[in-house]
């Protein structure tokens, strides 16, 4: 096919779920890379990103890989969901996380 429409939410809040999962050439098809995208430069950058615990380096690797996949239009993103959250002013300590919208930090919340 030439084009398909889909949606997706990550399993956890880490660049891996956005970049490695969707753009590594060894994950083509159902494992994640559904556009069958392949670029050796991106593969190298993504492998470097998961091989370091230095957050500054990791950010640089992911940003460089992201620039390439955006420039090559591996996917065309149509929109990002916008959230509106109603909250009682008596609730304290709630932190909204758009990636985990149904997960609540109840140990830190109070009334």
Task: Enumerate the predicted regions with their spans.
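Extracellular/periplasmic catalytic domains that process cell-envelope and extracellular macromolecules
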Residues: 13, 40, 69-71
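Periplasmic binding protein-like
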Residues: 1-29, 61
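Bilobed periplasmic-binding protein-like "clamshell/Venus-flytrap" ligand-binding domains
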Residues: 4-7, 52-89
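Short, solvent-exposed loop/beta-turn-alpha elements that line the ligand-binding surface or hinge
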Residues: 20-51, 79-111
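Weak global preference for isoleucine
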Residues: 3-5, 17, 70, 103-106
């Amino acid at each position: 096919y030439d084009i398909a429409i889909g949606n997706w939410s990550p399993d956890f809040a880490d660049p891996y779920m956005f970049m490695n999962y969707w753009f590594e050439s060894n994950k083509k098809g159902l494992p994640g890379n559904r556009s069958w995208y392949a670029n050796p430069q991106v593969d190298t950058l993504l492998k470097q990103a998961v091989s370091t615990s230095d957050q500054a380096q990791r950010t640089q690797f992911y940003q460089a890989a992201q620039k390439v996949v955006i420039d090559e239009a591996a996917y065309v993103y149509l929109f990002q969901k916008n959230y509106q959250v109603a909250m009682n002013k008596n609730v304290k300590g709630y932190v909204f996380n758009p990636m985990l919208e149904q997960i609540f930090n109840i140990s830190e919340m109070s009334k």
